[in-house]
Amino acid sequence: FASDPIDMNIGIDNVAAMYELTEMLIQRGYQNIGLLCANQEQWIFQQHLHGWYKAMLRHHMSPNRVINAALPPNFSTGASQLPEFLLAWPELDALVCVSDELACGALYECQRRRIKVPDDLAVVGFGDSDVSRVCQPPLTTMTVPHRKIGSEAGRALLERLNQGNWSDRKSIASSLCMRESC
């Protein structure tokens, strides 16, 4: 959700989604988890970071393995930032990326460096984009139901036009899509 919307606010709960994604890795036994962010709206970054911190601190784990790159959230950034993580935190055993494109870029860099995913390093993304299904290994990701969000936004707009009212906030559920990268 936008932190300060002008009017209607329809979307997923980014805090809860990032919490669930991070919690899943912790439950699977990962101990040294990093978070890779890239240029995105400040409010989205804050929500992702809040969900991340909440999960990490709940388990008394260090939430300090975070890189917020001032670069676009694409394949190249994911590939270029993985070495930065490994240099700063060689003990890294899992990487949460705020987009599937970042995660797939990190996966490509893992392949180039002969890092076995998920045996040596788990990598997860966010968004369930088409590329998450075809990268190798297929990417575990958080599904963002874009069609449903769009449908609800259209419905809300019609309700507003026809009836003059609408609740200002509606949460659409995201879901974890487990694949082979963790």
Question: Where does each model-flagged region fall?
Answer:
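Bacterial carbohydrate/catabolite-sensing allosteric modules
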Residues: 2-182
